[in-house]
Amino acid sequence: MAAKTKPQDWAYIAAAYQALNNNGLGYERMLALVQHIISSGASDRLFAYTSLDTLKLSNYEPLEESEVLCIHFDRQNQLFCFDYSATDYKLYDQEQPEFHRKYPAESGIEKFDQFLRWIRW
């Protein structure tokens, strides 16, 4: 059985990225994305937790390894990496999730909104 993770509060997630930025660690793009999720109202229907440079989101609570969008921000290359799988791809020995995309930092919010429409979240 897959591990289940309790979501974090969106204000906590935003504060975590703000603290990283305040320390000069370069997470402005992730903070902007989180602020967009909150201001757009998507936070009312999405559950999430963060682990430094990765934000994991789902429309189910608690979060599992399936039906989770993992957004990683590559600070060095200024790329958003989106990974999504309807199933726990690691459980089935797949090398990567069924949806794996990289986007330039300036496209991250737009691509996030497109993903939500595509997956109907």
Each predicted region: which residue ranges?
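Generic N-terminal initiation segments characterized by hydrophobic and/or small/turn-forming residues
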Residues: M30, S43, S66, I109, ...
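Mixed-charge, Lys/Arg-enriched low-complexity segments
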Residues: M1-A15, T87-W121
